[in-house]
Swiss-Prot record:
Keywords, alphabetical: Cytoplasm, Lipopolysaccharide biosynthesis, Nucleotidyltransferase, Transferase
Protein's cellular compartments: Cytoplasm
SUPFAM superfamilies noted in UniProt: Nucleotide-diphospho-sugar transferases
Protein name (Swiss-Prot/TrEMBL): 3-deoxy-manno-octulosonate cytidylyltransferase
Protein function: Activates KDO (a required 8-carbon sugar) for incorporation into bacterial lipopolysaccharide in Gram-negative bacteria.
Source organism of the structure: Afipia carboxidovorans (strain ATCC 49405 / DSM 1227 / KCTC 32145 / OM5) (Oligotropha carboxidovorans)
This enzyme's EC code(s): 2.7.7.38
Catalyzed reaction equations: 3-deoxy-alpha-D-manno-oct-2-ulosonate + CTP = CMP-3-deoxy-beta-D-manno-octulosonate + diphosphate
Superkingdom to which the source organism belongs: Bacteria
Gene name tied to this protein: kdsB
Amino acid sequence: MTEHDTLVLIPARMAASRLPGKPLLDIAGLPMIAQVLRRAREARLGRVAVATDSAEIAAAVAAEGGEAVMTSADHPSGSDRIFEALEKLDGEGRIKTVINVQGDLPTIAPADIRAVLQPFAEPTVDIATLAAQIRVAAEHDNPNVVKVVGSPLSQDTLRALYFTRCTAPFGEGPRYHHIGLYAYRRTALARFVALPPSSLERREKLEQLRALEAGMRIDVRIVDSVPLGVDTPDDLEAARRILAKQA
């Protein structure tokens, strides 16, 4: 993998029920989408673009000197949105690896974006993602904290066996909080978006289960902490405090 065959895509849309218009909300003097764009560029992995159905978001990206690609408003998931963007930006197939950075992670460490590629040293891995060890007791039983159950491959890598909102695995030992940042081999992304929603995906409301049920391999890199996702006004204020200190 090189910066010439890797594409970082940031899906972003305006329709957020708890925080309307959140990609354009100000954080430390910039729209949130511009902050995410900066973090992705700081990872220095190659071309970075925002995939959006909003002209307002595209304009904010352009104002930051970034690249935006317009996509359909009808996509059921961010994975479908980034696949459309990939096909529009690289119809020739030069890009081999795609990283999906959520558009509501303005404080994510660029090192964590780079870390998601490390499982691809193993050629049979289809999809790579991140997790961090749960250290707050209340998170073990919180259904909004998605846990990854996996077989350890090394001190900092798991092979994912399941993702769940339940408290899992049972018994003594660490549990891991899944972080929704993904890297896909291009062939794996094309296969994934062509699959219908799976039974466990619908039950847990976790689209990565579609890949596991189809026999695709997902490996998980363990990082130090979970980045702040901005979903509520309290999250927004926390992100503002974090980035104000870094300014």
